[in-house]
């Protein structure tokens, strides 16, 4: 019984330390990688890839053009059909993208790195709790 309690305490300490590290790294994160951009796009955009837009190449685009790709807009909150449609053309399972889309609904109209970071923290904690 004492060993089990000790294991739970150690696991809780590890989870707290990892969460603190995740948050510190998240605060210091100032850019996103291409795979992160694709994840955000697959979770929010109404087309599979932004480069399939007719005006994508040979045109200078402003910040709003890319924020539309990387964020859920006000009129899209609660709509998950984009995730389903995009995943029909992708090899990855849709559960992560559904979670990401849900999290992105809290930061409507602009890009935020936090929905993905919070999902990763939650998944990591749940994996460790299963151990």
Question: Which residues make up each language-model segment?
Answer:
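Interfacial juxtamembrane loops and adjacent helix segments
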Residues: 44-92, 100, 104-114
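Short, Lys/Arg-rich, polar N-terminal cytosolic tail immediately upstream
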Residues: 1-3
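Generic alpha-helical transmembrane segments of integral inner-membrane proteins
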Residues: 16, 20, 102, 118, ...
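Hydrophobic (often cysteine-bearing) scaffold residues that line and stabilize catalytic clefts
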Residues: 91, 95, 127
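Transmembrane-helix motifs of polytopic, lipid-linked glycan transferases
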Residues: 109, 114-131
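Transmembrane signal-anchor helices characteristic of membrane glycosylation enzymes that use polyprenol
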Residues: 6-70
């Amino acid at each position: 019984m004492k060993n089990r309690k000790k294991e739970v305490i150690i696991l809780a300490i590890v989870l707290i330390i990892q969460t603190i590290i995740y948050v510190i790294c998240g605060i210091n994160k100032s850019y996103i990688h291409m795979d992160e951009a694709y994840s955000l796009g697959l979770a929010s955009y109404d087309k599979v890839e932004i480069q399939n837009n007719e005006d994508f190449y040979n045109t200078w685009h402003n910040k709003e053009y890319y924020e539309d790709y990387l964020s859920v807009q006000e009129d899209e909150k609660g709509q998950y059909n984009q995730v389903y449609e995009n995943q029909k053309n992708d090899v990855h399972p849709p559960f992560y993208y559904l979670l990401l889309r849900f999290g992105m609904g809290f930061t409507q109209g602009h890009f935020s790195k936090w929905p993905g970071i919070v999902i990763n923290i939650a998944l990591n904690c749940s994996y460790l709790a299963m151990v």
